[in-house]
Amino acid sequence: MPPPTLTETIVGRACRALVLENDWLSTTILLDQGADIHTLVYKPKGVDVLWKPPRPPREPGVGPTPAGDSLAVWLTHYRGGWQTIFPNFGPAAEHQGAPLDFHGEAARTAWQVDAVEVAEARASVTLGVTLLKSPFRIERQMALDAHRPVLSIRETITNDGPEAMDCMWGHHPAFGAPLLSPDSFIDTGARLIETDDGYAAPGNDLPLGQAGRWPAIANRRGEPVDLSRPPAPGSGHSRVLFLKDFENSWYAITNPVLGFGAGLVWDGRLFPYACFWQETGGVREYPFFGAAYVTAIEPNSSYPGQGLPAVIHKTGTHLVVGPGESRTVELKAVLYSGVRRVIRIDPHGNVWHGN
């Protein structure tokens, strides 16, 4: 089997990027935009499983900086795909003397390449960034073996400051069609769910602050909703909820018509929650104008995604990282063939299907 490869490329007009691939999987990493995982392609089917917004983003450094707050900046440059969310998750906020951006600074900052290793059996790249608005630096190693459709990620945050720092930390992979469809199944090791208590979007059909057991919940009319089955495109839903109480920290989206799926498994000790964001045409104005069809399931240290000060006040699930302290999380994204529902993804990225 050919060895995995790592090559340089340009995305759009000028965004520096890397392509890490083997015979099974190809991924594009945007160095100039948060080290976003822009594509995750299952090569046997030729399908990129990650969602892209219906309207093209403005490229960083091209044209004037958009007016408005950090949410406006995020939406202007958002390319879909998969982001690191750090040190804030949700609305912009002031905390510990710093203005924290919407969804944090890490995803809007250029990262550098710190190390590259390419061998017959494995290719890896180590990326890094030093933040400006908090005393953190982040290191992320991404690796691909020659013979498996499994992308391994090892990410470390380090507090270089003299004081303990509060933060929220997560990953934001967003999945779209054709993987996502009404034929698809969403399976997970989570046992409990809780809807966001402040998400009052017009398309949100779920009651606010409602607890339940995965995957069943009642909508605002009292009708049953099976969250493991995606609604159809254009069905007008806009949902935010949180997955909790994981027996094992994993999820999978399987499309039996296409005969393959995508899954994620991670260290649940550091990321015990996952935000579930779903748009099926519910946001009919800016920024999606009714055209979004996306489900993102986002492992996170904390919940809800309402900004760091709100999380400290509401749930106390934020991280506190001491001076000089580091924290490390490991995640694996796996692409797999199959038509049956997934009952488990183990920490090595092996996928187990039901009967």
Regions found by a protein language model. Give the residues of each.
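Surface-exposed acidic/polar loop and edge beta-strand patches at domain peripheries
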Residues: 1-152, 163-166, 170-355
